[in-house]
Amino acid sequence: MLRFIQLLPQVSPKGDFILKDLPGSGKRIDILCRDLAACFSWGPITWLKASLELIAIIADTTILTFRHPGDEIPQNEVGWALVIRNSLREQPPEWVSVSNGSVEEIIKMYSNPPESTLWVLDEKGSHVSEIETKLHITQNSFMLGNHKGFNSQTEELIAKYKLPRVSLGKKSYLSSHCVASIISEFERSENVE
Ligand SMILES: C[S@@+](CC[C@H](N)C(=O)[O-])C[C@H]1O[C@@H](n2cnc3c(N)ncnc32)[C@H](O)[C@@H]1O
């Protein structure tokens, strides 16, 4: 299982955004729509989609956990936005679960090295090629910031739990690009073995 954790501290947990204005009314909910498309639609080539999970932490109060939608896969950004909106309005499809929770609770759940490692995706971390050997001896989760990166509360948690930082290079990429790159990194290393 490969897991992505997208932090969205500014998004409202009420699901009250307008479909025609996702970045503005949704306070950058478009980031999550693109992550989901990268994770379950165009990102994986050989990696089993059933072995992917994407968690969105909304406003540090609400957790949406997305698994492979199968035949119900949304076809575009608005389709994903509808799924997110319905889930936040207590009408999730079977492949989305909704719960209460915070960034710290999710960190405690998935950062249990050496069995389970929570990596922070950060331009300034160790390059992914340097940690490649470690990736195969642990269950991996990758945490992503929003368009502004990580806020000060999250930075404090990253320091408190000593979360390792991993980089895809010095350039700042869209989080959807990071999701797809991590999946291809795993696909590539599986093919090498
Ligand atoms: C659009 S970027 C945020 C850019 C923001 N200017 C910043 O300073 O963090 C969204 C998230 O994608 C991830 N990210 C972007 N580029 C990356 C890279 N080169 N390596 C690792 N993670 C990256 C980080 O988690 C980042 O918080």
Label each PLM-derived region with a short phrase.
Residues 2-123:
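RNA substrate-binding interface of SAM-dependent RNA methyltransferases
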Residues 23-27, 73-76, 137-140, 162, ...:
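Short, low-complexity, polar/charged sequence segments that are solvent-exposed and flexible
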Residues 29-32, 79-82, 146, 167-170, ...:
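Glycine-rich loops and low-complexity Gly/Arg-rich segments
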Residues 30, 144-152, 172-176:
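Short, amphipathic alpha-helical segments
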Residues 96-101, 148, 161, 171-173:
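Short, exposed beta-strand "edge-strand" segments with a Pro/Gly-rich flavor and a Y/T-containing core
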Residues 100-143, 149-157:
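Active-site cofactor/cluster-binding pocket
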Residues 153-193:
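Structured adenosyl-cofactor binding patch, chiefly the S-adenosyl-L-methionine
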